Amino acid sequence: MTNSSIFYVFYGLIQGITEFIPISSSGHLNILEILFKNLESRNYLYETSAHFASLLALLLYLFTNKHFSKSNIKAYWKILIYATVPAIILGLILKIYDVSYINLELIGYTTIAGAILLYVSDKAKKIKLKIKKKSTKFILAGFFQCLAFLPGFSRAGSCIIAFRLFGESRKNSSIYSLYMGIPIICLSFFSNIKEFENFIVDKNLTLIFITTFFAAYFTITVFIKVINKIGFTPFVIYRILLGLILLIYLS
């Protein structure tokens, strides 16, 4: 297997494993690209393929595990649209002004900051916010989700932090973060759909799609099954260690 193939296998595995748990897929992928010195030749076709595979894995999980029903779809689709508006607005602003801030030092700090907020939201019972309406919770979580524009913070993590602050269980917070991932991943996919014009399926594209799909489905299944038992502390510890390693490496 060539170095190029190894890179894309790792890319798919990292995307699939990290997309739906609170450790940041973008942060890990940026680290991978920097380590492989591949930022210059970034291929948005492969990135879009990975997002599509993640989306398919997520939808398959939700449908096969009966998280989606006619009543659920009817209850949530409008809420999810409203909850996604803050991310759409901020994303457009960043795109218009071509704001880019990929660097390992920032990823180190945001990884640690996200870990602290995740720990506080999970453990501090006294600061739980009493919000009864589920629609309000989702819309407020949409603002938290904007933290994910900081590389290393984690989209799933920002949503879980919000729902834990709103008093939801670990499992429900994690499932709601999956729901909120649907429109975001769809937007990410369709924003780069032009990359598929006149594309040719090659080995690397296939590697990314397959590894992302199976890694994502497996990770979601295990994560939702065990999260009430293990809690978020293992993710907090991992994030702090990763952040410290990055900052020490750069010092």
Language-model-derived ranges and their functions:
Residues 1-251:
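Multi-pass membrane proteins that catalyze or facilitate reactions on polyprenyl-/lipid-phosphate substrates
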